[in-house]
């Protein structure tokens, strides 16, 4: 498991906990393969080189506003410079509905010093959705019912 070599904000009391990082990536439900994962009722899910959460609050609290549309995207290979692009596709709709989202660095940080993108993943309607995050070489695919 690669340990990220990113700098925390100047003066930050945080430090990356390498053991917690490794454990997090090895134990989060999902797959290390680059394929779509059904989120189901799980809160944090891994697909490829991304872990995304909190799906539970996102789904239960959704009302179409940015305030209730926050998801954290944790890349396996953060570098501190790469933007995050998320393609959200409403599955089973005609015509197909696609929302393209773009989020730049800087990251936010967990208490364990793990970098993540904070986003307002605003989706316009309920239904079955596929999220495909891409940041540099990191990719993932998550399907869930909103």
Where are the model-predicted features located?
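Contiguous segments within soluble domain cores/interaction surfaces
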Residues: 1-124, 128-146
